[in-house]
């Protein structure tokens, strides 16, 4: 194949392959896990952990950073800070440092107020000895190095997801679904159910049909065989990783106002401000936006939809770590039902109550998050393989 015909994941693997074959003393990797499936990421992690040279990585993949790095350098407010350990150690140490500085700040403020009260009281006596004592304390106060209050953690987006109405208990029933493109069979005769309140992650290698499944459920494309049924009062909100739900020729403001004409200009601006679009930025045309900016517009529309069944295709793509954490919080507080495709293992661990792995044209069901999946993967894969052989 020519490289210009390859997918994002295939191009990433080719670039990594060329780089690793040179066996350099230092590797400089910019978002190396982007577009890679879980098996490819696991292989890369193992390679890097056994690599003898130095590795310098820019990444938003928290699970990857936990597995691979031994030191974290953070750029914040124009300054560099260094932390020993992996991402988890960095996150914990940063919080400890902030808590200690905050405690030091409040203790100093309390002491300053106490000394100021004592000085005021001494001066109120209006005696020479008391005034000298007050002046002495004032000089000591002037020599104090003031501790600055630590800045609040930056929360760039702020939003919540709330369904307009409660759906029935049976949200989605998939029966004997099959799909193939030309000679490539994606999945065959698959059946599963999703109940109200479940947060279901779909995982699997690239090209196995995960996104295709979501498009079938959103009636973007048709299945070859089988059917699916939505339950009572189910309303779907769809997040498309390629952002086809957005209109390239519209401005951000028009994207919201055209879909939600009942909103006032102020309400639209307030909504967009929650997703970091302020002032004249709301009049940017969709086609001029970056992937992360399009993602924020799509999330804004998702919030306004008030749907009770969210179907999300790679929702953390192009989001920075702070935005991912805010999205995780919103999804964990969401009272509706979620079905999503993701390669972000940290995100899956934080938000999934169940995992469907697409492997060998069928789905393997795991009742738990990503840690549970890793624990049970070999056992359940063998069980499903045996049942498939018996069916055949």
Role assignments for model-derived ranges:
Residues 1-105, 155-392:
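ABC ATP-binding cassette signature C-motif
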Residues 129, 142-153, 384-389:
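Proline-centered turn/helix-capping motifs that create local helix->coil transitions or kinks
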Residues 109, 127-134, 164-168, 320:
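Conserved phosphate/pyrophosphate-binding and hydrolysis machinery centered on Walker-type P-loop NTPases
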Residues 124-130, 156, 249:
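Short, flexible, glycine-rich and Lys/Arg-enriched loop motifs at helix boundaries
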Residues 93-118, 130, 134-144, 148:
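Intracellular alpha-helical coupling/juxtamembrane segments of multi-pass membrane proteins
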Residues 123-126, 145-148, 279, 377, ...:
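A general structural signal marking secondary-structure boundaries and capping sites
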